[in-house]
Amino acid sequence: MRDRSDPGPATRFPASRRGSAAIEFAAVVPIMILLAAGIVECGAVFQVYNQTNRLATQYAIVWSDCRDDTTSCQTELNTYTPDAAKGNVAPQLSPSRITLQMFQVRMSGTTPQVVYAYPAGATPTAAQIDAVQKTVPDRQTGVIVTATYRHSLMFFSALAAPFLDAAALAPSYTVTQLKT
């Protein structure tokens, strides 16, 4: 027969407080680590978006003031495209992950006519044409610069893979500038 003074394990266990701090710590720490990693990841993504925008803007501003003779604009365009030049404008970005599309266009009515293009033979997309139509008036010259950066996630690439293209973000900015 059982001793009635001993309440048994079923009633002793809930009353015991030994080890509760360790259990709470084990439950809270993974959540805190995920929150910290999420904050770092969001900061990195924000920086990539900001630097991609800066790159496109700087290229459009600088290229819009080249002289309009037959060789100077093309020569100037060729100096912007090497990885070293990209790295100087946006040092936080990896130059090998940057894709540039640059056009100098002359407007004829609402139709942009490409004068120079990088990469050679490229044609403006519908979004680029729409942007330049809003910025550059008839018989004026302007530039279109689109910078795209392929950013790989640091912490959550495996989790984000089903939602993103190969667990990477590709911010893209198009800037149009009236040629001075």
Residue ranges and their predicted role:
Residues R2-N88:
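Alpha-helical assembly-interface signal, strongest on the long, hydrophobic N-terminal helix that forms
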